[in-house]
């Protein structure tokens, strides 16, 4: 029974204490906003005094950088602090309340906006509570996803780096009314400005495409702008980021280079296959497709040509030249002696000088082999014997010799009457009989000579075409290698600056604090 009574007493005490604390907070709010007649539309300063606003930026995630839209999307916490003397209280008079949490729309706000936003939303979309301390210090840490404008330099894509910024200022108050500054932090009793974008290692998500190189912060004041202009001052947070090119190297760069180097294989194709021009045009079409893909990935700007675009244009010009060369080679290959004459200087240059320089194998000189000489000598012996046989046989015997034997007739025992071999009549008869055969043989020989000369000169044209092919191979390949290396080495030497700002040796990092 006593235990139950004790429990009830404790519960009642807790309820009383809770209601007492709640009443103290309500009393404090009533004191600040009703008794003091707090007006959130008025600045917390005298007429000629300026309210100092301190800013700091904590980066949670670099979400993306869309090159086509030139938009940087970041997830940040924008930290704002100022002093409002109208919100001061004595903690002992209000139950030692050390901090008061109120909705942001209940107090005066400096209206700090992102100037270079890219979506039309200048203000913070989510307004969290503000923290108010007895000294009148107001602390506000709203989260935000900003889409800021970031001019893209496409000159060295995909080996590029970009300098993006988030520019904050007040479009409502001038420099006379508020003063923007960076947040002051303390270490070992000494204060220093936070001149960098804060990154929490535990809460930061690394981007897979971009690497942060520098992240400085600066207060910019333009002396040429009047004091009563809101554009005189701003706080700018810079993000100097470098692209991780591995994705583009594997998916775009290597295929482009391999396809471009395939054009050298055109010179190895024989002209008779009829595929030289088709292969060159196929490579040209493949390069055009890659160029179209890249154009959709980058902003439509005429300020510069991206590095990979330069390579593709260089390759397309080279492939176009190869197509022209292929047409010329095919024209030379299919030339004939009936349409073109191969001059001696051209023959000497393309059949003797250049093949030796290009280490081309030359066909062996045509010459009679020993077997051919033996066959020719044996043929001459047969021809002489045939002539002797024909001189002794009459035409009727030559035509009906076997037929007379089949009819049982005796062979002629006497030889055909012929005039004496040395007589003029015999020579005339022999000449008249052999002349048609000799004329026919001469015709065949002359025709074969003409055909051989025709084929030989046509083969010379073919060899000239092969020499031109080899010469172009030795010219195009070094041009392709040197041009590719020269273009992409520009990207290899394109590195971000060692310091964020030219001429300023300060690194703007946590390790190099500038104590005040």
Swiss-Prot record:
Main location per the UniProt record: membrane
Glycosylation, residue list: 96, 163
Signal sequence annotation: 1-21
GO BP terms, alphabetized: acetylcholine receptor signaling pathway; chemical synaptic transmission; membrane depolarization; monoatomic ion transmembrane transport; musculoskeletal movement; skeletal muscle tissue growth
Domain of life: Eukaryota
Keywords: Cell membrane, Disulfide bond, Glycoprotein, Ion channel, Ion transport, Ligand-gated ion channel, Membrane, Phosphoprotein, Postsynaptic cell membrane, Receptor, Signal, Synapse, Transmembrane, Transmembrane helix, Transport
Record function comment: After binding acetylcholine, the AChR responds by an extensive change in conformation that affects all subunits and leads to opening of an ion-conducting channel across the plasma membrane.
Subunit structure: Pentamer of two alpha chains, and one each of the beta, delta, and gamma (in immature muscle) or epsilon (in mature muscle) chains. The muscle heteropentamer composed of alpha-1, beta-1, delta, epsilon subunits interacts with the alpha-conotoxin ImII.
Protein name: Acetylcholine receptor subunit delta
Species of provenance: Bos taurus (Bovine)
Gene transcribed to yield this protein: CHRND
């Amino acid at each position: 029974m006593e235990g139950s009574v004790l429990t009830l007493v404790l519960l009642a005490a807790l309820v009383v204490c809770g209601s007492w604390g709640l009443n103290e907070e309500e009393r404090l709010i009533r004191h600040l906003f009703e008794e003091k007649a707090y007006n959130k539309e008025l600045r917390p300063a005298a007429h000629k005094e300026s309210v100092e606003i301190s800013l700091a930026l904590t980066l949670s995630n670099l979400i993306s950088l869309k090159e086509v839209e030139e938009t940087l999307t970041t997830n940040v916490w924008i930290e704002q602090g100022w002093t409002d003397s109208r919100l001061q209280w004595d903690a002992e008079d209000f139950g030692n309340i050390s901090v008061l949490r109120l909705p942001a729309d209940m107090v005066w706000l400096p209206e700090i906006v992102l100037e270079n936003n890219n979506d039309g939303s200048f203000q913070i979309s989510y307004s969290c509570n503000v923290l108010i301390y007895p000294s009148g210090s107001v602390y506000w840490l709203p989260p935000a996803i900003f889409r800021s404008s970031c001019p893209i330099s496409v000159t060295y894509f995909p080996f590029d780096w970009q300098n993006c910024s988030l520019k904050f200022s007040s479009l409502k108050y001038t420099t006379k009314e508020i003063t923007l500054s960076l947040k002051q932090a303390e270490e070992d009793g000494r204060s220093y400005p936070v001149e960098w974008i804060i990154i929490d290692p535990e809460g930061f998500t690394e981007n897979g495409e971009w690497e942060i190189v520098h992240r400085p912060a600066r207060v910019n004041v333009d002396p040429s702008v009047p004091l009563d202009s809101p554009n005189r001052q701003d706080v700018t947070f810079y993000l100097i980021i470098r692209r991780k090119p591995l994705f583009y190297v594997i998916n775009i760069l290597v295929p482009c280079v391999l396809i471009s180097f395939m054009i050298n294989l055109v010179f190895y194709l024989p002209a008779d296959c009829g595929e030289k021009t088709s292969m060159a045009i196929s490579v040209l079409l493949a390069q055009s497709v890659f160029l179209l893909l890249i154009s959709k990935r980058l902003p439509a700007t005429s300020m510069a040509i991206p590095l990979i675009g330069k390579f593709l244009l260089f390759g397309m010009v080279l492939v176009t030249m190869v197509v022209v060369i292929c047409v010329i080679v095919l024209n030379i290959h299919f030339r004939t002696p009936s349409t073109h004459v191969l001059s001696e200087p051209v023959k000497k240059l393309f059949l003797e000088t250049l093949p030796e320089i290009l280490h081309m194998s030359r066909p062996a000189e045509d010459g009679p082999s020993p077997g051919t000489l033996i066959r020719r000598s044996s043929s001459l012996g047969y021809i002489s014997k045939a002539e002797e046989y024909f001189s002794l046989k009459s035409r009727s015997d030559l035509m009906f010799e076997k037929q007379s034997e089949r009819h049982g007739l005796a062979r002629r025992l006497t030889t055909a009457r012929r005039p004496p071999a040395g007589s003029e009549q015999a020579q005339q008869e022999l000449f008249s009989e052999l002349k048609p055969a000799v004329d026919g043989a001469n015709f065949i020989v002359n025709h074969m000579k003409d055909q051989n000369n025709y084929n030989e000169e046509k083969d010379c044209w073919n060899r000239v075409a092969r020499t031109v092919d080899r010469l172009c191979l030795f010219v195009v390949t070094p041009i392709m290698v040197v041009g590719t290396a020269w273009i992409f080495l520009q990207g290899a030497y394109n590195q971000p600056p060692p310091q964020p700002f030219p001429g300023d040796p300060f690194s703007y990092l946590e390790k190099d604090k500038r104590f005040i």
